[in-house]
Amino acid sequence: RDEKLYKALCDTVEDMLTAEDEFGRISSFTVPTEFHGWDLWCRKYVMLGMQYFMEICEDEDLKKRCVASMCRQCDYLISKLGPKREGKLPITSASECWRGLNSSSILEPVVRLYDLTGDKKYLDFASYIVSEGGTSICNIFDLAYEDKTDPYQYPVTKAYEMMSCFEGLLEYYRATGIERYKQAVIRFGRRILKTDITIIGSAGCTHELLDHSAARQTDTAYAGIMQETCVTVTWMKFCWQLLMLTGEVEFADSFERALY
């Protein structure tokens, strides 16, 4: 409970709130250029940052302002993103990167916003995101549930972004109780642990991609980039969530291995 650190966090959140534009957006993209690249990915972390900060925030007024801001942020997204038949942009088309996998990961803070507010429109938006399957070319949630394919064999294999999508699916299960999604998350986690987690607790020996790292980690050819720190930290966060969900010690062991 470092008072200086807490003040720095409060000041940072206050500063973030001033970045909101007249549409309720907190984005580094202008309106004409939004929904490209890493726009939604960054907006995800704006909302997640506020949500995690609220867990330690002692200022009730600041917490209320965070919730109000997040509602405006998400309401704007709901007005723009959705099925084509409604004249909206599909979530998996809101980035030209990784078939929309990065944009789909905004699922996590959307579900958490529903948990905070109880407003069904946020759960409905989360349900839409889940229905799109994470990418424009395959439904990664179905692949995980069917449990016939290792994640490094999926059509899109970006490690960090994929784990982030499954963190969102886990939150969606908690909100809905739909058993299919619980099993999809657990099966995905177990396959990652078996096929892609290395001896040092990370993954992705080909740049930042899942690539059967459990086997490829012994390859003597070095490509220059491997086992991204972002992948490691996200795997740790995912392991913690899986441990809370299942009580299975293997996820605690993998968390500790990555930490050390």
Each model region followed by its residue ranges:
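Glycan-recognition and catalytic cores of secretory/periplasmic carbohydrate-active enzymes
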Residues: R1-Y260
